[in-house]
Structure formats: C-alpha cells, structure tokens
Amino acid sequence: MQLVLAAKYIGAAIATIGLLGAGIGIAIVFAALINGTSRNPSLRNTLFPFAILGFALSEATGLFCLMISFLLLYGV
C-alpha cells in the first residue's frame, strides 16, 4: 500500500513539471508582445488579440497538467 501511495506522489510531482513550461510559455508570449509593441506602437491593437490567444493556449496546457496531477493524487 505504501508503494502505491509513493508512486502516486511521484507521478503527481512529475505531472506538475508541465506547469513550469506553461509559465515559461506565458512569459515568452508577453515578452514578444512588449517587443513588438515597442518596435511598432501602431500595431498594438493587432498584436494584443494574438497575445491573449497565446496566453490562453499556454495556460490551458498548464491546467491540463494540473488536472492530471490531481487525478493521480485523488483518483481511484
């Protein structure tokens, strides 16, 4: 029984590593937005929706990793 519990904890810890990638992805998206806006301020209204889309996709992958981690911990 202890081995199964330890495997659950290790699996959940490994699944949360994906949150690191989501955080880095969000930082890259907004760094590119700031860089693009500083180079050409008139494109701000064009670039912002693409940045929000990139943010949403990056955050979704992080939430999927978190969901898998919770399923490993509290699932059957």
Curated annotation (Swiss-Prot):
One of its GO terms (biological process) is proton motive force-driven ATP synthesis. GO terms for cellular component: mitochondrial membrane; proton-transporting ATP synthase complex; proton-transporting two-sector ATPase complex, proton-transporting domain. The keyword Transmembrane helix applies. It is found in: Mitochondrion membrane. Its main location: mitochondrion. The chain crosses the membrane at residues 14-34, 52-72. It is a multi-pass membrane protein. CDD domains: ATP-synt_Fo_c_ATP5G3. SUPFAM superfamilies: F1F0 ATP synthase subunit C. One of its GO terms (molecular function) is proton transmembrane transporter activity. It comes from the Eukaryota. InterPro entries: ATP_synth_F0_csu (IPR000454), ATP_synth_F0_csu_DDCD_BS (IPR020537), ATP_synth_F0_csu_sf (IPR038662), ATPase_proteolipid_c-like_dom (IPR002379), F/V-ATP_Csub_sf (IPR035921). The record marks 59 as: Reversibly protonated during proton transport. Pfam families: ATP-synt_C. Gene3D superfamilies: F1F0 ATP synthase subunit C (1.20.20.10). The keyword Membrane applies. Keywords: CF(0), Hydrogen ion transport, Ion transport, Lipid-binding, Membrane, Mitochondrion, Transmembrane, Transmembrane helix, Transport. PROSITE patterns: ATPASE_C (PS00605). Belongs to the ATPase C chain family. HAMAP family: ATP_synth_c_bact. F-type ATPases have 2 components, CF(1) - the catalytic core - and CF(0) - the membrane proton channel. CF(1) has five subunits: alpha(3), beta(3), gamma(1), delta(1), epsilon(1). CF(0) has three main subunits: a, b and c. Mitochondrial membrane ATP synthase (F(1)F(0) ATP synthase or Complex V) produces ATP from ADP in the presence of a proton gradient across the membrane which is generated by electron transport complexes of the respiratory chain. F-type ATPases consist of two structural domains, F(1) - containing the extramembraneous catalytic core and F(0) - containing the membrane proton channel, linked together by a central stalk and a peripheral stalk. During catalysis, ATP synthesis in the catalytic domain of F(1) is coupled via a rotary mechanism of the central stalk subunits to proton translocation. This is ATP synthase subunit 9, mitochondrial. The gene is ATP9.
